[in-house]
Amino acid sequence: MMGLTEGVFLILSGTQFTLGILVNCFIELVNGSSWFKTKRMSLSDFIITTLALLRIILLCIILTDSFLIEFSPNTHDSGIIMQIIDVSWTFTNHLSIWLATCLGVLYCLKIASFSHPTFLWLKWRVSRVMVWMLLGALLLSCGSTASLINEFKLYSVFRGIEATRNVTEHFRKKRSEYYLIHVLGTLWYLPPLIVSLASYSLLIFSLGRHTRQMLQNGTSSRDPTTEAHKRAIRIILSFFFLFLLYFLAFLIASFGNFLPKTKMAKMIGEVMTMFYPAGHSFILILGNSKLKQTFVVMLRCESGHLKPGSKGPIFS
């Protein structure tokens, strides 16, 4: 019989999954319909749309994992099922993180203003830079997925020894090796984190310099350039903090097998991991003028303040 903890876990998982799917499907529908009408899509819209699609897939993988943990733990821990989930999750997860990083770099190159030759060279070739970054993101995501092979082998040996309940020096050695490889696997997260932090720092410096220039000229600091800086900073900063929360949840879920309350640790980790792909996508909607306007119109239609089909004041 399902207990209170399991019930709360399933309710939270289902709620976050539903909200995440709605938010990311909204992005897909708005950008998809815009592309269908104009047959054109900006680089930022392409990244956001692809990111939303990956997050829909990621949420489905996490929900499947959550239900297997609750209703079929033996199936979840079996070799082939665990490997399929891990491979799917690792590739989708790393690619989505890199796409969010690429989006931050794109905002930085388009909005920040520096006279350094290297920055200007990158700024003038922003489209080419982003194409190479996206290709690099794909290759690094494949590399992180391929690195699971040794981890799977060690996990199989580790579980085989554990099943015999023969806790020997060999068992402890294999467990230590598995810990080490698993921890080293988290190093794949460092490059996108460093790049995001660099983009955030450049935008902060650029905003500070721009604000000082506005004050010296006696003009308002709330000009379009300043607002663009602030909007990009909010998006990158939210990604940074949500990613750290997501990374913590990943560690809890991954090392759940080695904690005293295994199932509880896994459930906490699974619930926390769903917050990032839903929360950051909602922040992307608020930071994108087209998505935000469509979202506001939709809310007004739902509340009865605006008739369906009318544009409303925000489009005038």
Swiss-Prot record:
Annotated membrane topology: Multi-pass membrane protein
Instruction: Write out the topological domains of type Cytoplasmic.
Output: 28-42, 116-128, 208-234, 288-316
Q: Where in the cell is it found?
A: Membrane
What tissues contain this protein? Expressed in subsets of taste receptor cells of the tongue and palate epithelium and exclusively in gustducin-positive cells. Expressed in the antrum and fundus (part of the stomach), duodenum and in gastric endocrine cells.
Membrane-crossing segments per the record: 7-27, 43-63, 95-115, 129-149, 187-207, 235-255, 267-287
Asked whether the UniProt record includes Glycoprotein among its keywords, one would answer yes
Select a single GO molecular function from the record's annotations and give it. G protein-coupled receptor activity
**What cellular component terms from Gene Ontology apply here?**
membrane; plasma membrane
Q: Which residues are glycosylated?
A: 166
Kindly list the biological process annotations in GO that this record carries.
Answer: detection of chemical stimulus involved in sensory perception of bitter taste
Q: Which residues lie on this side of the membrane: Extracellular?
A: 1-6, 64-94, 150-186, 256-266
Question: Could you tell me which SUPFAM superfamilies the record lists for this protein?
Answer: Family A G protein-coupled receptor-like (SSF81321)
Predominant localisation class: membrane
UniProt entry tagged with the keyword Glycoprotein: yes
Keyword list (alphabetical) reads: G-protein coupled receptor, Glycoprotein, Membrane, Receptor, Sensory transduction, Taste, Transducer, Transmembrane, Transmembrane helix
* Main function: Gustducin-coupled receptor implicated in the perception of bitter compounds in the oral cavity and the gastrointestinal tract. Signals through PLCB2 and the calcium-regulated cation channel TRPM5.
Q: Which family does it belong to?
A: Belongs to the G-protein coupled receptor T2R family.
Q: What else is known?
A: Several bitter taste receptors are expressed in a single taste receptor cell.
What name does UniProt use for this protein?
Taste receptor type 2 member 3
What is the species of this protein?
Homo sapiens (Human)
